[in-house]
Amino acid sequence: MPSKRKRNPLQYQTSGSLDEETNQRSAFPQIDNNSASESLEYDIPLDGLDYLATVREEARKLVPFVAARREPETRETIPLRKLEIEAGKKSFDPFLRYLLNIIDKEGERLEQYMESSSLDASILPKNLQQWRVYIEHKAPCWAILAVVDLATVLEILESLSSWLEKDAIDLQSQWIFCFCYKLPELLNGEDISTLRSVLKSLRSTHTSFPALQMSASALQAVLVYRYGQKDLFQT
């Protein structure tokens, strides 16, 4: 059995004296310098305190260096940073806001009409089939928009993509735009999901008709800015 190495007792304390270079106390136990020098002569592995003594001894032999002072950045020295903007978002954003502004203003006019006029719900079409015929032949009017409820608006919008006819698409597009006036500031998740599906259908149907795509953009503006559907910027 190999004999154990005799080691000199080390004198240490848990809080060392101030270091001349850093003006701070050592975080490790303070070891006597003579003991450290003796430990360096051994070829066998050092124990924990001997290792610390070795590191201290080597650190004292290192050539000191001076770090260059970094000048604070000024307006002239800060490099220009390229803004990362999604493709098309920069130019498309003002257009959606413009449409939303129209919707907000017309929505206010509709509310004023509702407050100042006597409303008659009996003039409304009775079912979806009657709504389909009505929308194909008549332009939107305040009297109808004032009395139609949100549930009916959502139901019509959900059906409109399958009702679209080339001969009636201009009138149908007007109704889509005007139905946006009826959309409230707050809407539950299920109804928002319905509107997202409507937008997707409009974007994939009759894409060569500017009036229809304009109305789809109006719905998109409401979804993006009023209901926080930011992923629809480029839909």
From Swiss-Prot:
Region (Disordered): 1-34
Polar residues bias spans: 24-34
Residues with Phosphoserine modification: 117-118
UniProt keyword Secreted, yes or no: no
A Gene Ontology BP annotation from the UniProt entry: spliceosomal snRNP assembly
Compartment(s): Nucleus
GO cellular component: cytosol; nucleus; SMN complex
Primary location recorded for the protein, binned into one broad class: nucleus
Residues spanning the signal sequence: none
Function: The SMN complex catalyzes the assembly of small nuclear ribonucleoproteins (snRNPs), the building blocks of the spliceosome, and thereby plays an important role in the splicing of cellular pre-mRNAs. Most spliceosomal snRNPs contain a common set of Sm proteins smb1, smd1, smd2, smd3, sme1, smf1 and smg1 that assemble in a heptameric protein ring on the Sm site of the small nuclear RNA to form the core snRNP. In the cytosol, the Sm proteins smd1, smd2, sme1, smf1 and smg1 (5Sm) are trapped in an inactive 6S pICln-Sm complex by the chaperone saf5.
Record text on subunit structure and interactions: Part of the core SMN complex at least composed of smn1, yip11/gem2, gem6, gem7 and gem8. Interacts with smn1; the interaction is direct.
Similarity annotation: Belongs to the gemin-2 family.
Name the UniProt record assigns to this protein: SMN complex subunit yip11/gem2
Chain's gene name: yip11
